[in-house]
Amino acid sequence: MKDKSIKVLEFNKIQEFLKNYTCTKAAKDIIEDLKPYDSVYEVREHLEETKEAFKLLITKGAPPFEGVYDIRSGISLAEKRSTLLPGQLLKIAAVLRCARRFKEYINHKEEEESYRVLENICEGIFSLPKIEEEIFNAIEGEDEIADRASSTLYNIRRSLKEKNYSVRDKINSLVRSYSSYLQENIYTVRGDRYVLPVKAEHKGAVPGLVHDQSSTGATLFIEPMSLVNLNNEIKELMLKEKAEIERILTVLSAKINANITGVKTDANIVWELDFIFAKAKFASEYNCTCPTINDEGIVDIIEGRHPLIDRREVVPISVKLGEEFTSLMITGPNTGGKTVTLKTVGLIHLMAMSGLMIPARENSVISYFNNVFADIGDEQSIEQSLSTFSSHMKNIVEIMDKADENSLVLFDELGAGTDPTEGAALAISILENLRKRGTKIIATTHYSELKAYALKKEGVENASVEFDVETLRPTYRLLIGIPGKSNAFEISKRLGLPDYIIDFARENISNENIRFEELIENLQEKSIKAQEDARLAENLKLERDKEKKKYEEKLEGLQKVRDNALIDARREAKNIIKEAKEEADKILKDIRQLERMGYSSDARRKLEEERKKLKDKLDSIEEKEIKTVHKGEALKNVKEGDEVLLASINQKVIVLSKPDNKGDVLVQAGIMKITANIKDLRAAKGSNSNSSSSKIKKSKKLNLNLRRVESSVDLRGMDAEEAIYTVDKYLDEAYLGGLGEVTIVHGKGTGVLRKTIMDMLKGHSHVKKYRLGEYGEGGTGVTVVELK
């Protein structure tokens, strides 16, 4: 990729923007060296890592980069077996902690989306928690070693503290004794030794060692002889403390050196992740999307925005290239946005090929090009004494020498700066030569000859930047398929140029040129109208899809409620049957107990008969229930993924496991996973019309009930028996309707009805808890019930 083109397209400014989102100098250095990658595979992988980081920012929030540093200098010293400073060790530990936490941050549950590229990067993390912990345990700050760093250090500092207390007690006593000889009744420290500020004329009155004097010489700082030994002991302890700290730092530094490969690897991964997440943060800030990358020269930028233009003012452009045509000629007035269009296309390609998401709509397509050449702006050099034309031609010669079918070439005002006739002819020749090579070209021009060339030549298409003649301002919108119209006469007229001058000018233009311009104007108007209609249709489609999605979600929610209600009802029915059977067995057990106690065996026989009748009747009810749900033969074999009918709940389910030795299988019913026996499974296609009809009717009835259920029931005016029946029926409907909380209005009155309702609620199967209403809810006139 040519460095000159990268500079012209201002990719360096994107790099500077990216640096603002990094946490470390090392990541900034990675961005400084960022350039388009050398293969389409690399581009896709680096785009994927950016996309994954972007998703993680949304789903998990900010990554764990707190306290991460650039530790390259510390690593370099550790490699040389040097002893590191406390601050350097702390920063290394912080980076190791960041690497470990990032591994935890990237982890996901089985049902969550995976992050393939980032997970592969994080697999290289060594994780050195022991070293990390030792450093944080031993060092508390940039220049502070913790007492707990070693038992020796702890003992030294404890002794040092005790000695200091002793010296301070002693010197305070001396201050009182020598107060008449001192400048001030205080003590101070000179060279780690406690001294007294003695007046120079009384130096003989305080025997001791002189350590310093004031700037005027009026005060001598004397260490009393009685403190010399104590001060010596303190000094010795301080030297021991220093030696122990040095030993601790040496040991920790040696551990870094012993694990230098892991430390360097973890640090490099953290810096790479810092760079990747800087790309993601940039994408989030600039509303970027991940484009589809191909290597076939196909470009489809949908509403691309130049990232260096103020987001409140930038006008999105849509550009296609490479399928129906490989060359695009853009015409239009000066300051109309032609050059911005070229730079937008070029810069978006450089961003995508450097692994950055692009400021464009979803589903945009970018092609990987080996080279992007840009001849944009006036690049003439005063030192080289080159004219505008010569400067452009120098660039073009270099482009012609290197461009091939895997190149994108951007020409701004091709052929300008010389005689229009010769310039147009030269431009057509250059374009045609590159087109035959298969080069993808976007060029801006003022020449009508190039408009005509694009109209005639297959594989070349016209485009124009829209201009509003009413306001005399460009709209900056790109219209593909329509050549730009010269607006010189209209602009001149609106600016006040007399009509007779404009009319005379028109007479000097050939009829063919006039008709050509009129044709272009007509095409522009039709194209603008068609694009407006297309935008309106797109907006209507989006609105329709939005409404459709909303109602589908509502329908799905109701379906889930229905499924859960059916499953709960069937499960409750089975529990009732099971409890009845257990009760019958309990009765029989009691009868046997009575018989052992001497009661008549005849009574036992009669109760045994009653039990058998009850059991037979319950079995009959259960069998009848299953049969009425669905007629058909039980399946003999099923496999994972089969869609079958679970007869007991009349519900289609998906088989999740093979039958075990008891014939039990795991199935998915709606959003629930339940265990069922293979005998309860039927072929999904085997349901007859009657059962289907029955199922539909039940479903409709349930949905109807769900729509009608209210959040409160009014019992005022009812007697106790009627109120209990009404509340019981209402709670069933509210429970099936999925209501979490309901209100029972019973009025205040004498309180009899309230007490009756509360007694009933105590043992109700649907009630989780209840309470009297609060102020604003109805007070003691209502009872608020929370359902299970």
Swiss-Prot record:
Enzyme type, top EC level: hydrolase
Keywords on record: ATP-binding, DNA-binding, Endonuclease, Hydrolase, Nuclease, Nucleotide-binding, RNA-binding, rRNA-binding
Keyword rRNA-binding annotated: yes
Chain ranges of the Smr domain: 713-788
InterPro entries: DNA_mismatch_repair_MutS_C (IPR000432), DNA_mismatch_repair_MutS_core (IPR007696), DNA_mismatch_repair_MutS_sf (IPR036187), MSSS (IPR046893), MutS (IPR045076), MutS2 (IPR005747), P-loop_NTPase (IPR027417), Smr_dom (IPR002625)
Keyword Thylakoid assigned: no
MF GO annotations: ATP binding; ATP hydrolysis activity; ATP-dependent DNA damage sensor activity; endonuclease activity; mismatched DNA binding; ribosomal large subunit binding; rRNA binding
Positions bound to ATP: 332-339
EC number(s) recorded for this UniProt protein: 3.1.-.-, 3.6.4.-
SMART domains assigned to the protein according to its UniProt record, in alphabetical order: MUTSac (SM00534), MUTSd (SM00533), SMR (SM00463)
A single BP term in Gene Ontology: rescue of stalled ribosome
Record family assignment: Belongs to the DNA mismatch repair MutS family. MutS2 subfamily.
Free-text function comment from the UniProt entry: Endonuclease that is involved in the suppression of homologous recombination and thus may have a key role in the control of bacterial genetic diversity. Acts as a ribosome collision sensor, splitting the ribosome into its 2 subunits. Detects stalled/collided 70S ribosomes which it binds and splits by an ATP-hydrolysis driven conformational change. Acts upstream of the ribosome quality control system (RQC), a ribosome-associated complex that mediates the extraction of incompletely synthesized nascent chains from stalled ribosomes and their subsequent degradation. Probably generates substrates for RQC.
Protein name according to UniProt: Endonuclease MutS2
